[in-house]
Amino acid sequence: EKLPLCEGSLCEMVRAKVSRTIQEKELEELKAKGAGTEDGEPIVVDELDADEVSRLLLEVDHERADIDPYDEKILTDPNRGHWDLWCDSEADGCPVLDLSYQGYVARNPRADINRNRIVAIDFGTKSTVVVYQNEDSRILPVRVGTGNVSKSIRAEHYENPTIIEFNDIESFLEAYAATLGRPATRWDDVYISHRAVDDLQSSLSTDYSAFFSELKQWAGDAGVKKAIRIRDRQDNDYLLKAFRELTDEDLNPIELYAYYLGLYINNMRNGIFLNYYLSFPVTYEFAVREKIAESFERGIKKALPEPLLRDEEIMRNFRINGSISEPAAYAVCALQEYGFEPEGNEEVFYSVFDFGGGTTDFDFGVWRESRAPKYDYTIEHFGA
């Protein structure tokens, strides 16, 4: 069956697929017939049949971020359903694409919000670790850019390299800006983490400028004033400003890295998370911490479904908490793992030396039983 007029995030992906799969002459014929105009009228996507769109729906996050395709039952199971088929009828830009006649089920992404669950992100110089709470309150790590998640797991898979590879920046940014949330970006345009490292190790020296692995140093170094030149694999040059001088319109690798982390965290397998904890080196100035947190917020929000982003009540509960230092975060985990459980007025004094991939931090403080009923312990840390 042929599809009706189409708008919205999913349809941007359909359009992208159309432009890549039909010949230029055929596309010009479609435009001549009024199948798309410069003033924003929707394109008729009848050159793709419903089976092809079904495949796109199942592979939507594989196309975006190399995440394993969803199983077919997500489209027809009344207790599941697909986010990209859902829209709020009163919302602007609500997609017209309706596949209910195929027996497909739309799912309101609000139903998948993991309330009171948290995500913790250790944004490291060489690698980044991400963990989240599942419905059983178990803490699970996330691996990014390793390809098929069913292949054998190694511990180092969860140390996600802090690196980004630019293949086609223009194509990526065009798609990234096209919709409010879950844009029709392509993984092949920008890689991060394990995939980017694999490519770096096999690349020629002439391709090194397509890789950027100093995200954290770039953000934290107050002495970096000159612009950094990035050249993608299409030989397009981009000047990357000093981090502190970036505006919201500038290319921001930290935001793009966070966007991909957001896709791996928030999807139709894991659900949606609104509470994030981000650790920082002790020595980072408050303004830098705040700007990094803002970059993560923009990137992670971009990975969320549009109905949530348009819901002010829900988004008031979205937060990036960046108040804890990296050594203090380690102290919280280590003290509990080693069985330090102070009671009453008992206090445990600690100090931590954190020899990281690019920085060395020191923190010291006091660990005691919490007086607040919703917490077990309180840590008072002083830094150095």
Question: What does each model-found stretch correspond to?
Answer:
Residues 1, 102-206, 286, 290-384:
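Oxyanion-binding/catalytic loops of NTP- or PPi-dependent enzymes
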Residues 93-97, 105-107, 251-256, 325-328:
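Short linear motifs at secondary-structure transitions and domain/linker junctions
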Residues 87-90, 191, 222, 371:
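Short, isolated positions within intrinsically disordered regulatory regions of eukaryotic proteins
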Residues 1-55, 158-284:
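Conserved phosphate-binding loops in N-terminal lobes of ATP-dependent enzymes
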Residues 68, 279, 322-325:
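N-terminal low-hydrophobic presequence detector
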Residues 93-95, 239-246, 316-319:
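Generic detector of short, locally flexible boundary/turn motifs and exposed helical patches
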Residues 83-86, 187, 218, 367:
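A residue-identity detector for tryptophan
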Residues 6-9, 14, 23-27, 31-44, ...:
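Nucleic acid-processing catalytic cores of prokaryotic defense/repair systems
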